[in-house]
């Protein structure tokens, strides 16, 4: 136990009192006072710069390393830093910027007095000191947590390798959408966030069924706080793309193959969603918004200590949203609840338990028929919808999460995370029939409307455990991580139908009789069970001060059970088991300067798939290789990140639609396996603070996927995308005003209909948006967002025989009060 100190003393006096009154060696041992002393005092230490290399580790070891490498005297108390972990520090820095980076996000503050630095924990900043709470991070020292930083980038990310590396140190393309950017752009759902990311595109098959693509493949792996979940793109039970993002701190997107950490999956991307965590100091806000089409939203977020000593902390978030839309008879209703408790079980152990529940209820359905039976494209009003007024589609998603972080000796760390997800879907709609490569709409408007009833239950369990830390070899410090993760996914999906109704689509006014229980026709049952587990090991070898090599491998076991049958018939189950599948990973990073690096990486691809052939049998696993090389820059002490990447993906057994319906499948489209498929592309991105007060996020992406004969695959997706968004806080007497705006551009996309020797093309288009925020006082701010200011009409996504219009010009006003 540390000796209590008079609370009236300032941090420097407190530290010096400890130093002088507890000078005997045995007393220092008994008290556990952390004291790092230099052998000589150096004057003007604040102005001096050093080339530093301090990996992320326990705060005690990081401060000792800083004292040694800068020849500086550091004073601190173990009870202030117990259980805390530093950020990584690398490059050339002065003492002040070094402290800001190491201490960011910890609630610690520092005071420099000549060659002596005192580090303490405190509830409030005082004269001559800088407060670095978990939600008030000085922009010169960013860390993982983005909330409260005002930044469009982050200093540390672990999604790609599970190691705490900067974006520049990671040999893959990483995009981070921070809390500030989500607030500035008024991004409310996961699909809104992802479609604002360069290289990410969308198709929509009707209703609330989003397919999100990256590098030519659908994204089907989503992580929540690093625990992997699976999204089935066949049954379209896709809760991950519909999630409200109000409870998240940031969203990290690692593009390309990530099999080392996630196991089976496409070489598209992994989306890691990081929830907000409790803060050591009280903070809260309430927020209300109104907007176009009767948009109303209210939310509250409260966080802080639950005990006097702050060792137990909690956070609660709630949101309610109701809105109509630009489409007739189509409304949305969201309810979000999130609670989490975090505790310092010991000075080196942190445990966390949280629950979040989201309900998403929709009346009606978006989308319009995109082509007539004669092959002529349609041109409906954006207000047109294709569902009866009584149609609905309801999702309820509940997540239970647990986390444990244990600091070990010699700067090693053990982490354990577990999650359970439960999803219920209930849908009853009357929809315009959609089938790939076929239209059911005559030129005179006559067509059939079919009632569809879907019930689905999805359960997922996930565990992720890692042990990591530094080790010495050949005079250099290296990082090693070993781990295990497990995923169990079950999805039971039943689809029934009602009698077809003949209507005229031009004047049906979205009204048809709702089928009674005695009119329901049994349809199909579709069950999937997917279990995978794997052990992985990876190491970051610092071969020289400038050359870093990451080598890793994963050994995985898979079991995939699949059954599709018409109700009343006997199921025909299919099972695939793979054991000991090895996925290698290699990445190399060379530091050109303290701010710029070049890199190259390689990994294997393995993905069991539920795309089926004409007999209903799943295709063999997709296999391949992923190559990437690029350049990265980290400027202005990490406040600005830039990257350029070139990539190539080679795959066999890639599923391609045959446009044929599998017999007795309820409309399931058959696929064929394509060998020799190749995807090539480039990603360019810039994010962060370009100048004081000026935040920018921009990026360009090009991708093209071809089969072995050079034929382009997925032409319904744009090959090129450009995203730009920026905000500027005005200086001087206008400092209360922040202005922002941006533009999204997608290149041409084409949906082909071979049956009619026809196609539907969406030409390239721009969508422009603006925002303005005025800070009324220190606590209250008002924000105006205007989207699609030029009211561009365009298809945001095309699939099957449906098109989905992007929203017309719209506006929201949000009022936020921070306590």
From Swiss-Prot:
The keyword Calcium does not apply. This is Ferric-pyoverdine 358 receptor. A motif (TonB box) lies at residues 115-122. Residues 281-819 form the TBDR beta-barrel domain. Residues 166-276 form the TBDR plug domain. Pfam families: Plug (PF07715), STN (PF07660), TonB_dep_Rec_b-barrel (PF00593). Keywords: Cell outer membrane, Ion transport, Iron, Iron transport, Membrane, Receptor, Signal, TonB box, Transmembrane, Transmembrane beta strand, Transport. Specific receptor for the siderophore ferric pyoverdine (pseudobactin) 358. It is found in: Cell outer membrane. One of its GO terms (molecular function) is signaling receptor activity. A motif (TonB C-terminal box) lies at residues 802-819. One of its GO terms (cellular component) is cell outer membrane. Belongs to the TonB-dependent receptor family. It is a multi-pass membrane protein. It comes from Pseudomonas putida. The gene is pupA. It comes from the Bacteria. Residues 1-47 form the signal peptide. InterPro entries: Plug_dom, Plug_dom_sf, Secretin/TonB_short_N, TonB-dep_rcpt-like, TonB-dep_rcpt_b-brl, TonB_box_CS, TonB_rcpt_b-brl_sf, TonB_rcpt_CS. NCBIfam families: TonB-siderophor.
């Amino acid at each position: 136990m540390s000796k209590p100190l008079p609370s009236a003393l300032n941090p420097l006096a407190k530290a010096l009192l400890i130093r002088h009154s507890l000078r005997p060696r045995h007393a220092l041992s008994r008290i556990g006072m952390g004291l790092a002393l230099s052998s000589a005092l150096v004057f003007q230490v604040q102005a001096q710069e050093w080339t530093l290399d301090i990996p992320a580790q326990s705060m005690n070891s990081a401060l000792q390393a800083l004292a040694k490498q800068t020849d500086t005297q550091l004073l601190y108390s173990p009870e202030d830093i117990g259980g805390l972990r530093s950020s990584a520090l690398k490059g050339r820095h002065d003492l002040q910027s070094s402290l800001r980076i190491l201490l960011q996000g910890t609630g610690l503050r520092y005071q420099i007095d000549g060659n002596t630095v005192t580090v303490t924990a405190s509830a409030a900043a005082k004269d001559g000191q800088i407060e670095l709470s978990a939600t008030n991070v000085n922009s010169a020292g960013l860390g993982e947590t983005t909330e409260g930083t005002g930044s469009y980038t982050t200093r540390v990310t672990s999604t790609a390798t599970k190691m705490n590396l900067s974006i520049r140190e990671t040999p893959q393309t990483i995009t981070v959408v921070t809390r500030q950017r989500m607030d500035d752009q008024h991004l409310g759902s996961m699909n809104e966030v992802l479609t604002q990311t360069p290289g990410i595109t969308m198709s929509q098959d009707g209703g609330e069924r989003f397919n999100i693509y990256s590098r030519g493949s659908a994204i089907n792996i989503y992580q929540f706080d690093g625990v992997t979940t699976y999204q089935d793109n066949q049954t379209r039970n896709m809760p991950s793309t519909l999630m409200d993002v109000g409870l998240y701190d940031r969203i990290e997107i690692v593009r390309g193959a990530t099999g080392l950490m996630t196991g089976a999956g496409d070489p598209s991307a992994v989306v890691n969603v990081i929830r907000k965590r409790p803060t050591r100091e009280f903070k809260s806000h309430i927020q209300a918004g109104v907007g176009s089409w009767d948009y109303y939203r209210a939310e509250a977020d409260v966080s802080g200590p639950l005990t006097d000593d702050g060792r137990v902390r909690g956070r609660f978030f709630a949101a309610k949203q109701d809105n109509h839309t630009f489409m007739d008879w189509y409304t949305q209703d969201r309810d979000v609840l999130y609670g989490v408790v975090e505790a310092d079980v010991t000075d080196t152990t942190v445990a966390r338990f949280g629950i979040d529940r989201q309900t998403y209820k929709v009346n009606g359905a978006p989308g319009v028929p995109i082509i007539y039976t004669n092959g002529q494209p349609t041109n409906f009003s954006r207000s047109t919808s294709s569902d009866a007024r009584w149609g609905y589609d309801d999702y309820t998603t509940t997540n239970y999460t647990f986390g444990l972080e244990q600091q070990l000796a010699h700067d090693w760390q053990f982490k354990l995370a577990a999650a359970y997800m439960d999803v219920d879907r209930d849908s009853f709609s009357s929809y315009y029939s959609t089938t790939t490569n076929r239209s059911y709409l005559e030129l005179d408007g006559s067509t059939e409307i079919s009632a569809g009833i879907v019930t689905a239950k999805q359960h997922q369990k996930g565990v992720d455990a890692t042990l990591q830390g530094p080790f010495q070899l050949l005079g250099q410090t290296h990082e090693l991580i070993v781990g295990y993760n497990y995923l169990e996914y079950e999805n039971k999906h039943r689809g029934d139908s009602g009698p077809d109704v003949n209507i005229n689509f031009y004047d049906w006014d979205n009204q048809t009789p709702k089928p009674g229980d005695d009119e329901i026709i049994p349809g199909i049952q579709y069950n999937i069970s997917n279990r995978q587990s794997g052990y992985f090991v990876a190491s970051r070898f610092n071969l020289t001060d400038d050359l870093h090599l990451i080598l890793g491998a994963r050994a995985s076991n898979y079991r995939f059970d699949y059954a599709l049958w018409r109700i009343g018939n006997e199921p025909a189950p299919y099972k695939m088991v793979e054991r000991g599948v090895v996925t290698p990973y290699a990445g190399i990073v060379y530091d050109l300067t303290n701010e710029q690096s070049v890199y190259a990486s390689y990994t294997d691809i393995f993905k069991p798939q539920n795309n089926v052939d004409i007999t209903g049998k799943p295709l063999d696993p997709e296999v391949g290789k992923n190559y990437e090389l690029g350049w990265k820059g980290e400027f202005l002490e990490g406040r600005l990140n830039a990257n350029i990447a070139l990539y190539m993906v080679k795959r066999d057994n890639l599923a391609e639609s045959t446009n044929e319906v599998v017999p007795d499948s309820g409309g399931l489209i058959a696929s064929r396996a394509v060998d020799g498929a190749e995807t090539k592309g480039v990603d360019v991105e810039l994010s962060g603070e370009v100048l004081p007060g000026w935040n920018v996020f921009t990026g360009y992406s090009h991708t093209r996927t071809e089969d072995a004969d050079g034929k382009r695959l997925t032409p319904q997706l744009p090959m090129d995308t450009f995203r730009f968004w920026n905000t500027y806080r005005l200086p001087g007497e206008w400092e209360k005003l922040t202005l922002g705006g941006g533009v999204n551009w997608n290149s041409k996309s084409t949906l082909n209909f071979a049956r009619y020797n026809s196609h539907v093309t969406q030409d390239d288009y721009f969508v422009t948006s603006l925002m303005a925020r005025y800070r009324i006082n220190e606590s209250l701010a008002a924000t105006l967002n205007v989207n699609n200011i030029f009211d561009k009409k365009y298809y945001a996504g095309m699939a099957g025989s449906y098109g989905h219009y992007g929203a017309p010009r719209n506006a929201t006003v949000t009022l936020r009060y921070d306590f």
